[in-house]
């Protein structure tokens, strides 16, 4: 009995072991039959945790790489500014003011160029523009001026002390320029979902030949001068009325931005000192600057700037800027002679004695007339490039604050004008599409002379080859000045002969030159002068040989 009782627990243990083994084998078989479920159940949380960690690590790596690249880019920019664009380090570079001006100009040319299309600026370019402009403008935060203020002590006594505050011109104009900058970028961002698109001129010519729409190509002759610009296209029915109103509103806003940028730029240029090198390069006489014909008209009693401009050949931009340079140089030459005092110890020649006989009031009168002529010329051609004096001021300017304001306003002026020009192109195409059966003028927009104009800013030999952004004619939202081709008077020899004879007849001698400062002639004198010009035009139309 004892042996049998001892063997019973052993048998039970073996049975339990066999049952455990069988259960384990069945469990293993079940696991083998459904391996995917167990693998998914056990591996999914681990793999998800690893993927999240990898994504976070990649993001951190990208951020660190971008920060390193930004730091390296900032080091490169400021190294060029400190070296004055002279990479040899020998100290032959340009001054800091000109280096900052060149940097802002080149940055705008790199990111915006000619602004071929009305479309949002890519995010990378927008971030690069804001980041690098912030780097270049940060120096203005440390340009201050000392002003006296009164400080009150606890015992009631007052003491006058000098405190620092931002310089007045930067404090007023720089925030305004930043606001204009943001507004221009917002206007570009608004052209995201549009009813128009752009087609390259080669593709457009192929499509026109295929569908027979040669009239559209023929009417769009203005684009032939700028073959690189794509041509805007709209649907056959044209733009919707709401879209056209929004487009016109954007044009008006951009035009106001353009006027504000031009005003800041002109004020800044006027505040810059005239370089001595420019004054030394002027000739000794105003007649040498203006030429005999313009000088005789200015020194005459019958002087009218508008009539004088009508008889001059202003058919091209080159001729207009040449006359502007000559008139501007004569203005400063006469002012220089008025303010200068002749030396009494040196022996003068008879020619210098005759020049000294001319009264200072008469020289100022001539300078005032030349200024009125230059003003009329700029009003007739508001998009003229910078004159030789303006470029000389930019080149020899030492004031960093004025250099920042001038270059920043100039690039915003260029960007705003390009936006206005592209909107005018689009509005013209829309009008052409809506009224394809009517006779449409073959000039685009409100101004027929829309060729790009670059501002030639003098740079050093060490500057990276680049160009200033285009600066084209301003088109006012209220009144648009006509292009040279529209108001150009036929420059026959009879016009100049009659006008010269009329002026010569009434031309006074220098000693009889009036002392009054008025630069405008009476209405009767101007009417008589215009009458002579009209008669000469009628004669030239009847007989071209006269």
Curated annotation (Swiss-Prot):
Localization per record: Cytoplasm; Cell membrane
Domain PRONE: 61-440
Region named Disordered: 1-48, 463-491
Pfam families: PRONE (PF03759)
GO MF entries: guanyl-nucleotide exchange factor activity
InterPro entries linked: PRONE_dom, RopGEF
GO biological-process terms attached to the record: plant-type cell wall organization
Its job: Guanine-nucleotide exchange factor (GEF) that acts as an activator of Rop (Rho of plants) GTPases by promoting the exchange of GDP for GTP. In postembryonic roots, modulates root stem cell maintenance by regulating the expression of PLT1 and PLT2, which are key transcription factors that mediate the patterning of the root stem cell niche. May connect RopGEF-regulated Rac/Rop signaling and auxin-dependent PLT-regulated root pattern formation.
The record's note on its domains: The PRONE (plant-specific Rop nucleotide exchanger) domain is responsible for the GEF activity.
Protein name: Rop guanine nucleotide exchange factor 7
Organism of provenance: Arabidopsis thaliana
Gene designation: ROPGEF7
